[in-house]
Amino acid sequence: MKKISRRSFLAAAGVSAAALALTACGGSGNSTAASSAAASTAPAGDAAAAASDPKVTLVYAEVNPLDTIVGQTGSHFKEKVEELTGGSVVIDVQASGVLGSENDVLDAILGGSTSIDISRISAFALTSYGCNKSKLLSIPFTFENRAHFWNFANSELAPEFLNEPQELGLPVRGIFYGEEGFRHFFTVKPVSGIADFKGLKLRVSNDPVMNGMVEGLGANPTVVSFGELYSALQTGVVDGAEQPIANYKSNAFPEVANNLILDGHTLGAVQAVITDNAWNKLTENQQAAVMEAAADTQAFNADLSETAENKVLDELKSSGCNVIDVPDKAPWQEACAKVISENTSDQAELYQQLLDMKA
């Protein structure tokens, strides 16, 4: 992956964040000139002024432990928000799923609950609530590599995806993108290739795209909540599942499913969303500081993800995990052809824009 300087990355992310902020405040999110101007003039003064504003505590939900890529990303966001607001906005990060599964949290905040203010979710999690653009980020083999994803996340197209919930009348808005590495399957029994997946019971989260992908591999999609996955693997309810490498290790899945096949079927794209109720608690100065922190966090995540993933993979290999490389992904892509076609045909032009952003 081509390395991007943090300064350049923040500049690009700032444009995306500014475009989002303009749209959230009623301005046009389509004006490049307006977005650039906002990025260059909004943050510094407003963020400094935020220190004298009324104190607000916002609860941030994270389903994974703090030592994962997404957990560290949440911690960084907390630090930056509190730094840029002089402590007038405090982020209370609740990790390891203590507030419930991703779906539990979304159901709560979209149902009007005010006990959770910000949630880190899978980038496609809002698909179940009508956000069809986000679904495209979960299509198998869309992103060739990390640089491909970050080309999208720092483009003028990204705010269009992040703003979709607002356009649909949902009481949340996206504030930044991130990723936790490519997702790979892991199994209880050894596998050597795609042929070994036939008949396996693979855990899914009841997402239509994931269901179709698993069926395309000849396996049986089996719905199990993330919190119950460890015991489901241990007791034979499922034969395998899929996660990014860091989450696989941090959640102790190698203890019960020690075979990791590096198929990289999708990139684990994530986003953070803030509720309208929480956003409206903030002054304009605090909102500007939160968006500056969001842009910085997006850059932090890009710096962290690949390095952290490679470190974890080395640790897994050293500890005896059976790591299986997949040098030829063509059979996997062919197996997913149907689910790709079925889930992109209604947004073919937009999906092609994503594909064309490859590095």
What would you call each of these model-derived segments?
Residues K2-I4, A12-V15, G26-A38, A48-A147, ...:
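N-terminal secretory/targeting leader peptides
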Residues H148-P159:
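A gly/proline- and charged-residue-enriched helix-loop-helix capping module
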